[in-house]
Amino acid sequence: MLTEQPNWLIQRAQLTPERIALIFENKQMTFRELYHASKQMAARLSKYCSLKKGDRAAILLSNRPEMVYAVHACFLLGAEAVLLNTKLSKQERLFQLEDSQAKLLLMEDGFCREEYESAVATADVDELQAEEAGDIEPEAYVTLDDTATLMYTSGTTGRPKGVQQTFGNHYSSAVSSALNLGVTERDRWLIALPLFHISGLSALFKSVIYGMPVVLHQKFSVTDVLDSISSHQVTIISAVQTMLSGLLAETEQCPESLRCILLGGGPAPLPLLEECRRKQFPVFQSYGLTETCSQIVTLSPEFSMDKLGSAGKPLFSCEIRIEKDGNPCAPFEHGEITVKGPNVMKGYYHRDDANQAAFHNGWFKTGDLGYLDDEGFLYVLDRRSDLIISGGENIYPAEVEAALLAHPAVAEAGVSGSEDPKWGKVPHAFLVLTSSVSSEELTAFCRERLAKYKIPAAFFEVDGLPRNASNKLMRHRLNELRKGELS
């Protein structure tokens, strides 16, 4: 049985050295140049930071070439990369640094080194890049069962857990994605999502495994992304709903080169899908988690309207099962989504309790609720922890949010349960509005689309909704926004 592979970047630089690997701010870099830059960073990390095989290096960088070098440099040294969210607070990062037992924190301007020096050795990436590199003998192979990256769950509930993503997980994810989406020599994958998020990071590994350029953006800007798609002939883009909405608002026709918009972060509402179809945007809806190293389920565009709201079918070599009380559910029966496949993490770092709760007979319990139809298409209903039980009836916030998003005045919607003396809990809606609207109008609008018990008892206007790094709505924080009730 295969247990190791040649280091992906080393082999890619040998196979296609002059092929474009990375495009950033209109500057191009070949795979030969990417390997050279990554090897130099590895040499500096070894020489000045004493990073070595078996260590963990935490990376706190924005989307930039040095972030790409840093990840590959860790692998060239045989070290694990701990990806830190740039949006977290100091206390949240300190917890992850301590929990991961990182030896080094690699950071950039904008973060205060002094805040972390009591917990871990620190290095500024720009200062490090200015030092003489020297030379190293890189680790020529990767062991598939070894942890490549440690990425913390977004913490929609409870404290974050370190997800151990192996080289085998990342490789299987890349291969399964290629079998699903196809790969051509023309492909260029645009990433404007953060590289500390699995949807962004996974594209770096696809790049070296496929021999495909990544067009990297520091952050998402509608104008910049549309310009980049045109000038670099981008064929694939990873996106979340807010990004897709922004692109649709600015163009009447999908850019000609674009063949795939891989959409994550939750089911797309009907009005958005209808606009995508009208403008011929090739949206592939997907379902995935940090624990599955990106998408594990994908819906092709030809099914997007016939299977409205579905996340699709599992990628090749992956499986889905819906369970209730440990037993498989029949088609259309609601239960917990469980998954199995070579891209599923090997476990949470030093969290035996969480691993025992999450795995059962090889199946990973996602904590999400859903069902399979009679053709095996997955429909994701909601997080189990977000379910609202009102007078004995189950209310899925995502269903209520989808109804509200169909209203022309509603740009974003979040729904959570609020304590009620009669019903136990009732839904409250938190809305980002584009124009004024009354609660009476919204109630009437919902009445045409939802059962009476699902209609929000109150509506609140907010400036923005709380989201994690994966752009997933953090419904447990919505009640903190309880002001500005619509009359």
UniProtKB/Swiss-Prot annotation:
Cystine residue pairs: none
Pathway(s) it belongs to: Quinol/quinone metabolism; 1,4-dihydroxy-2-naphthoate biosynthesis; 1,4-dihydroxy-2-naphthoate from chorismate: step 5/7; Quinol/quinone metabolism; menaquinone biosynthesis
EC assignment: 6.2.1.26
Matching Gene3D superfamilies: 3.30.300.30, N-terminal domain of ligase-like (3.40.50.12780)
Keyword Nucleotide-binding in record: yes
GO BP terms in the entry: fatty acid metabolic process; menaquinone biosynthetic process
Keyword field: ATP-binding, Ligase, Menaquinone biosynthesis, Nucleotide-binding
Catalytic activity as recorded in UniProt: 2-succinylbenzoate + ATP + CoA = 2-succinylbenzoyl-CoA + AMP + diphosphate
GO molecular function ontology, one term from the record: ATP binding
Source taxon at top rank: Bacteria
CDD domains from the UniProt entry: OSB_CoA_lg (cd05912)
Stored InterPro entries: AMP-bd_C (IPR025110), AMP-bd_C_sf (IPR045851), AMP-binding_CS (IPR020845), AMP-dep_synth/lig_dom (IPR000873), ANL_N_sf (IPR042099), MenE (IPR010192)
SUPFAM superfamilies assigned to the protein according to its UniProt record, in alphabetical order: Acetyl-CoA synthetase-like
Pfam families, sorted: AMP-binding, AMP-binding_C
HAMAP family, per database record: MenE
Described function: Converts 2-succinylbenzoate (OSB) to 2-succinylbenzoyl-CoA (OSB-CoA).
Protein family according to the UniProt entry: Belongs to the ATP-dependent AMP-binding enzyme family. MenE subfamily.
Record protein name field: 2-succinylbenzoate--CoA ligase
Gene: menE
